[in-house]
């Protein structure tokens, strides 16, 4: 609220549910965007006719993606043959996966986070379910929570593609800067892009010769970001819609042989 009152530009790197105001932007996708894209992918790329859904109750992220997927599925003629849910803290998904296996869907959309996704996929394979598992960007790092065999063919929507040259360079620079061996998850490049977008806005205001801190300067920063047309970041190119949500490519990551491609 204070940022809105003062006109300071804010870019939220990773909250798809934050309230958007005239001077507040997102660097990440909103939940409906991901759910719709995955329904499209199921039908257009996987030729799926039936789907099951597995989501977390009481979780805005999970329910948001689930609702968007189901709505788009209805529009596309993708039949939802089973819907299963779990509560925060649950770890045993045998019952839900047994039900899903019995429904025999072509795909299972599981808009949940990687740890629970790994448990669910492992339980599904044990129950005899061979459907393709699909997730949102919360699936990132799922390969650390289930076997390569169980994950084979699973796909998820991501804000960036790990294999691109720009991402590879970012990962190497990140590991060197913080003296770590682990590859950063999606939140690091999103935070980097958020800072980059702010810098581009500031640069535009400076080039106009405006005085920092004035209302004209603040508005120039906002206008520069709002009017971006394909500005390149680590996670993709940025333009913004009327609600200050990013219009950027969606990367579909597939788990193959234990690797993300």
What is the role of each PLM region?
Residues 1-82, 130-159:
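Extracytoplasmic ligand/sensor domains, especially the bilobed periplasmic-binding protein
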Residues 1-2, 50-56, 104-114, 120, ...:
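Periplasmic-binding protein-like
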Residues 34-37, 84-100, 165-169:
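Structural motif
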Residues 40-47, 70-78, 98-105, 122-129, ...:
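Sec-exported extracytoplasmic/periplasmic mature domains
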Residues 80, 260-261:
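Residue-level detector of beta-propeller blades
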Residues 91-95, 101-127, 197, 253:
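Hydrophobic alpha-helical
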Residues 121-192, 205:
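Extracellular/periplasmic periplasmic-binding protein-like sensory domains
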Residues 174, 178-188, 199-260:
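Segments of small-molecule ligand-sensing domains
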């Amino acid at each position: 609220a204070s940022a809105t009152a003062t006109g300071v530009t804010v870019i939220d790197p990773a909250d798809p549910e934050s309230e958007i105001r005239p001077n507040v932007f997102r660097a990440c996708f909103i939940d409906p965007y991901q759910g719709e894209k995955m329904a499209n992918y199921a039908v257009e790329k996987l030729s799926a006719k039936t789907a099951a859904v597995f989501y977390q109750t009481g979780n805005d992220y999970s329910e948001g993606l689930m609702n968007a997927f189901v709505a788009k599925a209805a529009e596309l003629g993708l039949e939802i043959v089973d819907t299963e849910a779990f509560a925060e803290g649950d770890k045993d998904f045998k019952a839900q996966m047994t039900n899903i296996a019995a429904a025999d869907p072509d795909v299972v959309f599981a808009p949940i986070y990687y740890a629970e996704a790994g448990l669910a996929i492992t339980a599904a394979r044990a129950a005899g379910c061979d459907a393709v598992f699909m997730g949102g960007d919360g699936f990132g790092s799922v390969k650390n929570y289930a076997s390569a065999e169980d994950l084979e063919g699973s796909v998820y929507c991501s804000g960036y593609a790990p294999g691109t040259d720009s991402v590879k360079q970012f990962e190497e620079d990140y590991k060197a800067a913080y003296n770590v061996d682990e590859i950063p998850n999606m939140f690091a490049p999103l935070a980097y892009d958020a800072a980059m977008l702010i810098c581009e806005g500031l640069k535009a205001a400076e080039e106009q010769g405006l005085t920092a801190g004035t209302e004209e300067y603040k508005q120039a920063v906002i206008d520069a970001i709002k009017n971006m047309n394909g500005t390149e970041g680590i996670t993709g190119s940025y333009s913004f819609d009327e609600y200050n949500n990013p219009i950027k490519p969606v990367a579909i990551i597939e788990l193959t042989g234990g690797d993300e491609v």
